[in-house]
Protein backbone atom coordinates (compact mmCIF):
# COMPACT_ATOMS: atom_id res chain seq x y z
CA UNK A 1 0.00 0.00 0.00
CA UNK A 2 1.57 3.23 -1.15
CA UNK A 3 -0.82 5.58 0.63
CA UNK A 4 -0.45 6.86 4.15
CA UNK A 5 -3.64 5.01 5.04
CA UNK A 6 -2.47 1.50 4.16
CA UNK A 7 -4.37 -0.99 6.35
CA UNK A 8 -2.66 -3.35 8.74
CA UNK A 9 -4.49 -4.67 11.74
CA UNK A 10 -1.05 -4.75 13.29
CA UNK A 11 -0.89 -1.13 12.21
CA UNK A 12 -3.62 1.08 10.80
CA UNK A 13 -5.22 1.83 7.48
CA UNK A 14 -5.75 5.47 8.03
CA UNK A 15 -3.22 8.23 8.29
CA UNK A 16 -2.22 8.70 11.88
CA UNK A 17 -1.14 11.95 13.41
CA UNK A 18 1.68 12.55 15.85
CA UNK A 19 0.56 12.74 19.44
CA UNK A 20 1.15 15.89 21.44
CA UNK A 21 -0.23 17.59 24.49
CA UNK A 22 -2.12 20.06 22.31
CA UNK A 23 -4.17 17.38 20.58
CA UNK A 24 -7.54 16.08 21.84
CA UNK A 25 -7.80 12.71 23.50
CA UNK A 26 -9.04 9.72 21.53
CA UNK A 27 -12.24 7.82 22.40
CA UNK A 28 -11.52 5.24 25.11
CA UNK A 29 -12.86 1.71 24.69
CA UNK A 30 -12.10 -2.01 24.94
CA UNK A 31 -12.79 -4.69 22.34
CA UNK A 32 -11.98 -8.17 21.11
CA UNK A 33 -9.76 -8.28 18.01
CA UNK A 34 -10.61 -11.10 15.58
CA UNK A 35 -8.62 -11.99 12.46
CA UNK A 36 -9.54 -14.77 10.03
CA UNK A 37 -7.57 -16.29 7.14
CA UNK A 38 -8.89 -18.04 3.99
CA UNK A 39 -8.43 -21.45 5.65
CA UNK A 40 -10.93 -20.28 8.30
CA UNK A 41 -8.33 -20.12 11.06
CA UNK A 42 -9.09 -17.33 13.51
CA UNK A 43 -6.79 -15.42 15.83
CA UNK A 44 -8.11 -13.44 18.79
CA UNK A 45 -6.67 -10.83 21.10
CA UNK A 46 -7.96 -8.16 23.44
CA UNK A 47 -7.39 -4.44 23.01
CA UNK A 48 -7.79 -1.61 25.52
CA UNK A 49 -7.60 1.97 24.28
CA UNK A 50 -7.00 4.60 26.94
CA UNK A 51 -6.04 8.27 26.78
CA UNK A 52 -3.20 8.18 24.22
CA UNK A 53 -2.38 4.67 25.45
CA UNK A 54 -3.08 1.26 23.92
CA UNK A 55 -2.79 -2.23 25.44
CA UNK A 56 -2.97 -5.47 23.45
CA UNK A 57 -3.15 -8.94 25.06
CA UNK A 58 -2.62 -12.16 23.08
CA UNK A 59 -1.18 -15.69 23.21
CA UNK A 60 2.24 -16.38 21.67
CA UNK A 61 4.11 -19.68 21.97
CA UNK A 62 1.69 -20.79 24.72
CA UNK A 63 2.41 -17.64 26.72
CA UNK A 64 0.30 -14.59 27.37
CA UNK A 65 2.03 -11.47 26.13
CA UNK A 66 1.02 -7.85 26.57
CA UNK A 67 2.07 -4.96 24.37
CA UNK A 68 1.58 -1.40 25.62
CA UNK A 69 2.11 1.67 23.48
CA UNK A 70 2.22 4.58 25.91
CA UNK A 71 2.30 7.89 24.03
CA UNK A 72 1.74 9.89 27.22
CA UNK A 73 5.08 8.70 28.59
CA UNK A 74 6.88 8.22 25.26
CA UNK A 75 7.51 4.50 25.66
CA UNK A 76 6.62 1.06 24.30
CA UNK A 77 6.42 -1.97 26.60
CA UNK A 78 6.33 -5.74 26.20
CA UNK A 79 5.11 -7.66 29.28
CA UNK A 80 5.36 -11.44 29.81
CA UNK A 81 3.13 -12.24 32.83
CA UNK A 82 4.30 -15.88 33.21
CA UNK A 83 7.87 -14.65 33.73
CA UNK A 84 6.93 -11.45 35.59
CA UNK A 85 9.26 -9.61 33.21
CA UNK A 86 9.06 -6.74 30.75
CA UNK A 87 11.04 -4.92 28.09
CA UNK A 88 10.85 -1.19 27.43
CA UNK A 89 11.79 1.07 24.55
CA UNK A 90 11.72 4.84 24.66
CA UNK A 91 9.88 6.43 21.75
CA UNK A 92 11.01 9.94 20.72
CA UNK A 93 8.26 12.53 20.43
CA UNK A 94 8.71 12.83 16.67
CA UNK A 95 8.15 9.07 16.23
CA UNK A 96 4.94 8.90 18.23
CA UNK A 97 1.81 8.06 16.27
CA UNK A 98 -1.72 7.76 17.61
CA UNK A 99 -3.99 6.04 15.07
CA UNK A 100 -6.97 6.68 17.35
CA UNK A 101 -6.88 10.41 16.59
CA UNK A 102 -8.43 11.60 13.32
CA UNK A 103 -6.37 13.63 10.86
CA UNK A 104 -6.70 17.36 11.48
CA UNK A 105 -6.16 18.67 7.94
CA UNK A 106 -6.29 17.56 4.31
CA UNK A 107 -2.68 18.30 3.38
CA UNK A 108 -1.17 14.87 2.53
CA UNK A 109 2.30 16.22 3.34
CA UNK A 110 1.34 16.50 7.02
CA UNK A 111 1.80 12.71 7.10
CA UNK A 112 5.01 12.50 5.04
CA UNK A 113 7.65 14.88 6.34
CA UNK A 114 10.09 14.57 3.45
CA UNK A 115 7.43 15.47 0.84
CA UNK A 116 6.35 18.83 -0.55
CA UNK A 117 2.71 19.47 -1.43
CA UNK A 118 0.91 22.06 -3.53
CA UNK A 119 -2.83 22.71 -3.42
CA UNK A 120 -4.15 22.61 -7.00
CA UNK A 121 -7.94 22.94 -6.75
CA UNK A 122 -11.17 22.33 -4.87
CA UNK A 123 -13.42 19.82 -6.62
CA UNK A 124 -16.27 17.35 -6.17
CA UNK A 125 -15.45 13.63 -6.38
CA UNK A 126 -17.81 10.68 -5.90
CA UNK A 127 -20.38 13.15 -4.56
CA UNK A 128 -18.06 14.53 -1.86
CA UNK A 129 -16.11 17.78 -1.60
CA UNK A 130 -12.35 17.30 -2.00
CA UNK A 131 -9.14 19.27 -2.38
CA UNK A 132 -6.69 18.20 -5.08
CA UNK A 133 -2.99 18.16 -4.16
CA UNK A 134 0.28 17.50 -5.95
CA UNK A 135 2.94 15.75 -3.87
CA UNK A 136 6.64 15.82 -4.77
CA UNK A 137 9.18 13.48 -3.18
CA UNK A 138 12.87 13.20 -4.01
CA UNK A 139 13.97 9.58 -3.76
CA UNK A 140 17.36 8.19 -4.78
CA UNK A 141 18.03 11.17 -7.00
CA UNK A 142 14.63 10.98 -8.71
CA UNK A 143 11.74 13.43 -8.41
CA UNK A 144 8.48 11.54 -7.92
CA UNK A 145 5.13 13.29 -8.39
CA UNK A 146 1.72 12.03 -7.32
CA UNK A 147 -1.82 13.44 -7.14
CA UNK A 148 -4.13 13.20 -4.12
CA UNK A 149 -7.83 14.08 -3.84
CA UNK A 150 -8.45 14.60 -0.11
CA UNK A 151 -11.92 14.42 1.45
CA UNK A 152 -12.77 17.76 3.07
CA UNK A 153 -14.83 16.22 5.90
CA UNK A 154 -12.62 13.27 6.86
CA UNK A 155 -9.23 14.47 5.56
CA UNK A 156 -8.61 11.10 3.89
CA UNK A 157 -7.65 10.39 0.26
CA UNK A 158 -10.58 9.42 -1.97
CA UNK A 159 -8.29 9.06 -4.97
CA UNK A 160 -4.50 8.84 -5.37
CA UNK A 161 -2.47 8.59 -8.59
CA UNK A 162 1.08 7.31 -8.09
CA UNK A 163 4.25 7.78 -10.17
CA UNK A 164 4.17 4.17 -11.40
CA UNK A 165 0.67 4.64 -12.83
CA UNK A 166 -1.23 2.84 -10.10
CA UNK A 167 -4.41 4.37 -8.70
CA UNK A 168 -6.09 4.04 -5.29
CA UNK A 169 -9.78 4.92 -4.85
CA UNK A 170 -12.02 5.04 -1.77
CA UNK A 171 -15.81 5.37 -2.09
CA UNK A 172 -18.64 5.57 0.45
CA UNK A 173 -21.15 2.80 -0.33
CA UNK A 174 -23.73 3.53 2.38
CA UNK A 175 -24.64 3.24 6.06
CA UNK A 176 -24.81 -0.15 7.81
CA UNK A 177 -25.26 -1.53 11.31
CA UNK A 178 -22.42 -3.84 12.38
CA UNK A 179 -22.51 -5.68 15.72
CA UNK A 180 -25.12 -3.18 16.88
CA UNK A 181 -23.03 -0.13 15.96
CA UNK A 182 -23.80 2.48 13.31
CA UNK A 183 -21.11 2.36 10.63
CA UNK A 184 -20.31 3.58 7.12
CA UNK A 185 -19.27 1.02 4.52
CA UNK A 186 -16.38 2.14 2.31
CA UNK A 187 -14.92 0.33 -0.69
CA UNK A 188 -11.22 0.70 -1.51
CA UNK A 189 -9.89 -0.26 -4.95
CA UNK A 190 -6.21 -0.37 -5.87
CA UNK A 191 -5.58 -0.59 -9.62
CA UNK A 192 -2.20 -1.44 -11.17
CA UNK A 193 -0.92 -0.20 -14.56
CA UNK A 194 -1.33 -3.71 -16.03
CA UNK A 195 -5.07 -3.62 -15.30
CA UNK A 196 -5.06 -5.84 -12.23
CA UNK A 197 -6.93 -4.52 -9.21
CA UNK A 198 -7.53 -5.42 -5.58
CA UNK A 199 -10.69 -4.42 -3.74
CA UNK A 200 -11.29 -4.31 0.01
CA UNK A 201 -14.22 -3.17 2.14
CA UNK A 202 -14.00 -1.20 5.37
CA UNK A 203 -16.65 -0.38 7.98
CA UNK A 204 -16.00 2.98 9.63
CA UNK A 205 -17.40 3.75 13.09
CA UNK A 206 -18.10 7.52 13.39
CA UNK A 207 -18.17 7.42 17.21
CA UNK A 208 -14.79 5.71 17.55
CA UNK A 209 -13.47 7.47 14.42
CA UNK A 210 -11.80 4.26 13.26
CA UNK A 211 -12.78 1.39 10.97
CA UNK A 212 -13.91 -1.60 13.01
CA UNK A 213 -13.90 -4.19 10.21
CA UNK A 214 -12.08 -4.83 6.95
CA UNK A 215 -12.60 -7.57 4.39
CA UNK A 216 -9.75 -8.32 2.00
CA UNK A 217 -9.75 -10.32 -1.22
CA UNK A 218 -9.10 -14.02 -0.80
CA UNK A 219 -11.20 -14.50 2.31
CA UNK A 220 -9.28 -12.46 4.87
CA UNK A 221 -11.14 -10.33 7.37
CA UNK A 222 -10.31 -8.56 10.61
CA UNK A 223 -12.59 -6.72 12.97
CA UNK A 224 -13.37 -5.49 16.46
CA UNK A 225 -16.13 -7.22 18.44
CA UNK A 226 -17.74 -6.65 21.82
CA UNK A 227 -16.82 -2.95 21.73
CA UNK A 228 -17.38 -1.22 25.06
CA UNK A 229 -16.93 2.54 25.15
CA UNK A 230 -15.74 3.61 28.61
CA UNK A 231 -12.71 5.17 30.34
CA UNK A 232 -9.96 2.59 30.80
CA UNK A 233 -8.21 2.20 34.19
CA UNK A 234 -4.67 3.55 34.43
CA UNK A 235 -3.21 0.27 35.73
CA UNK A 236 -3.72 -1.34 32.32
CA UNK A 237 -0.95 0.84 30.90
CA UNK A 238 1.66 0.47 33.65
CA UNK A 239 4.17 -2.22 34.62
CA UNK A 240 3.15 -4.26 37.71
CA UNK A 241 5.47 -3.51 40.67
CA UNK A 242 6.82 -7.07 40.89
CA UNK A 243 7.96 -7.24 37.25
CA UNK A 244 11.68 -7.25 36.41
CA UNK A 245 13.02 -5.36 33.43
CA UNK A 246 15.05 -7.48 30.98
CA UNK A 247 16.82 -6.99 27.66
CA UNK A 248 15.78 -8.81 24.46
CA UNK A 249 18.75 -11.16 24.93
CA UNK A 250 17.52 -12.14 28.40
CA UNK A 251 13.93 -12.73 27.35
CA UNK A 252 13.14 -16.47 27.01
CA UNK A 253 11.94 -18.78 25.68
CA UNK A 254 9.79 -16.80 23.24
CA UNK A 255 11.26 -14.06 21.09
CA UNK A 256 9.58 -10.67 21.33
CA UNK A 257 6.99 -9.85 18.65
CA UNK A 258 7.53 -7.05 16.17
CA UNK A 259 4.90 -4.74 17.57
CA UNK A 260 5.09 -2.19 20.33
CA UNK A 261 8.86 -2.44 20.69
CA UNK A 262 9.12 -0.92 17.25
CA UNK A 263 7.41 2.34 16.32
CA UNK A 264 3.82 1.15 16.58
CA UNK A 265 1.74 -1.24 18.58
CA UNK A 266 -1.01 -3.32 16.95
CA UNK A 267 -4.04 -1.12 16.51
CA UNK A 268 -7.44 -1.41 14.89
CA UNK A 269 -7.99 0.41 11.65
CA UNK A 270 -8.97 4.00 11.11
CA UNK A 271 -10.43 5.76 8.12
What do these predicted regions represent?
Residues 1-5:
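Positively charged n-region of N-terminal signal peptides that target proteins for export
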Residues 7-16:
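Bacterial N-terminal signal peptides
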Residues 19-55, 61-63, 83-84, 89, ...:
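N-terminal cleavable signal peptides for secretion/export
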Residues 21-23, 38, 82, 125-126, ...:
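Non-transmembrane domains of secretory- and envelope-associated proteins
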Residues 38-39, 138-147, 192-196:
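Short, cysteine-centered beta-strand-loop-beta hairpins and adjacent loop/turn segments enriched
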Residues 44-49, 68-69, 116-122, 171-176, ...:
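Short, exposed beta-strand/loop patches in secreted or surface proteins that constitute
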Residues 48-110, 121-161, 217-226:
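An acidic-aromatic
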Residues 107-119, 162-171:
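A short, amphipathic edge element
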Amino acid sequence: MKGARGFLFAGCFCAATGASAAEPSNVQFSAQVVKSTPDKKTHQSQIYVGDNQVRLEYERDSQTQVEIYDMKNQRALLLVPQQASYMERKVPQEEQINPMLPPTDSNPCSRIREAQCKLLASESLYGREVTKWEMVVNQEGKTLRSLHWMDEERHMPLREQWPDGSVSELRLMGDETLHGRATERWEMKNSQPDGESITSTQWYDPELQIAIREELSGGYFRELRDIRVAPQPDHLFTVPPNYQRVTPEQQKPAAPPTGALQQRAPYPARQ
